[in-house]
Structures are given as C-alpha cells and as structure tokens.
Amino acid sequence: MRGGRAVCFAWLALTAVPTDRLSAQEVAPNRATTYLHPTDVRDPRALWVNPAGLAVRRDASVYAELAVSDPGRGAGRLRQVSAGFNARGLAFGYQRDLFDSGRRGHTYRLGLAGGSEGLAVGAAMALYRGGTKGTGWDLGGSYVVAPALTVGGVIANIGQPVVRSLQQRVTFIPGATWRPLGPAATLSIHARIRTDVLGYAFGVSWQGVGRVPMGVLARLDTDGGLRRGAFAIGFSVGGPDRVGVVVSAPGDLSGPDAASLWGLSTREAGRSRH
C-alpha cells in the first residue's frame, strides 16, 4: 500500500510542474497544464489543456509564455517557451523545452474544435521532435449543464507516444467548474486518472472588470490520498490584451520551483457559447 502511494505521489510531482526533475527526464508538460483546468480554459492554451475550450468563444487570439525553474535562486533558468493562436476553433501551438543535457525538445500541436448550444468538442494532435519522433492525440469535450455549471473531460495521449524514451500513457481527465457568483468567480476541480495512478487538482479564480481588470487564480494538486503535491498562484492584468505571472511551489511550500510570464491578446467576434 505504501509503495502504491509512493508511486502516485511521484507521478503527481512529475506532471505538476516543469522543474529540474522534469528536465533530467527530458520530458515536460506544457506550463499551462499546471495552473489551468479542462473546464475553465477559453483561449489558445486550451490546445494543451482541453481542445474543446478552443470552441467556447468565437474569437481570434494569440498567446506566448516563458517558464523558468528555481526562480528563487538568482535569476532562475529558462526551461520552456510556448506560443500559439486560435481562430474560431482552429489552433496551432509550439512548445520548446530546454533540458539539463543541452538537448532541446520541440512539440508542435494542431487543434480543431466546434460547438453549439453549450456543447463543445475538440481534438488536438501533438508532434514530438528533438531527439525523438512521436505522435499523440487528445480528445476533449465540455458541456454547460446549467448557467453556473460546466462539466467536461479529456482523453489525453491517445496512441501512447514514446517521447525521449518515456512512454506517455493514456490519461482520462474529468472535471467540473462552478461559477457561484457569475462568470467573474470560478471553483474548479479535475482528476487525472491512469491505470496505475490517480491525482486531483482544485482551483479558484476571479477576474475583475473595469478600466484595468485584474485577475487572480490559485490551484492545489494532490495525490489520490489528497496529500499536497503542488501549489500554484497567479495574477493577471488587462482585458482583451492581458499579461500575467504564475508561480508554483511543491506541496510543502518550501519555496518557488517554477514561474512563468504569459501574454494573451484576444479579438472577440461574437458571444461565447458558455
């Protein structure tokens, strides 16, 4: 039993944040997956989190993000650069990872999504390059059950590609988002389920309005026994043109081990479907 718990906690630590441990194994999840949820993402970052989110809004948007490890130790070290765009459900993204060995990882991601009357579905194809060749697929969906409640999920790593000698196993990620005070405030939860491990993520966010809108988010990741594995907190400022910063720490809150700076520009073409 203890061995199973140890395996689960180790997997959560690996997938939670792109730290030095990730670099040593030369595989890293996209930074957005460490602080967003599959039922509450509505911009190009949905390409990495839940491709169905690409169809929630009828807009054209672009984003970019820089992530560093160990920001509390001097200037930190650049680990990941990612960027992408979404044009009404058609999206493309690129991720570049810098590993300790000096090797560079490249991930190209293409997504397509559509939706109607609260239902959105999407698919994304990932091409892995940089010392490896692999192809994987994600399928995602979301549905507005009630004005304040959205449910959805993702089947990730279909095809189980091998990326730099590490197989990416099929993962089921169900989730839900509740908006008790309207669209400004959200409470989200999702799980990551594989045949051998289980983890949860709980998050809250708030997005203000006005001349200079400000936003805040927080997320806690746990293992299947609800023991803390990682924590993230973020702040943003702006409306259609927005910038933000996210800082992550291990579950014991011993200090920041990753941070990222992101920018997003959106041009809305119509009402959102959610």
Which role does the model predict for each range below?
Residues V27-N30, A91-G182, L187-A191, H274:
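Outer-membrane pore/translocation modules
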Residues R57-S61, A87-G89, G114-A120, A146-A148, ...:
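Strand-connecting loop/turn motifs
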Residues M1-N30, S254-A258, T266-H274:
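Cleavable N-terminal export/targeting peptides
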Residues D43, R73-R77, G102-R104, G131-K133, ...:
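Short sequence motifs at beta-strands and strand-loop junctions characteristic
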Residues W48, Q80-S82, T107-G111, D138-G140, ...:
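Membrane-embedded beta-strand positions in outer-membrane beta-barrel channels/transporters
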Residues G152, V162-H274:
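Outer membrane beta-barrel transmembrane domains
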Residues R21-R88, A259, T266:
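N-terminal, post-signal peptide beta-strand-biased segments of exported outer-membrane/organellar beta-barrel
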Residues A32, H37-D40, E65-S69, Q95-F99, ...:
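Outer-membrane beta-barrel pore domains and translocons
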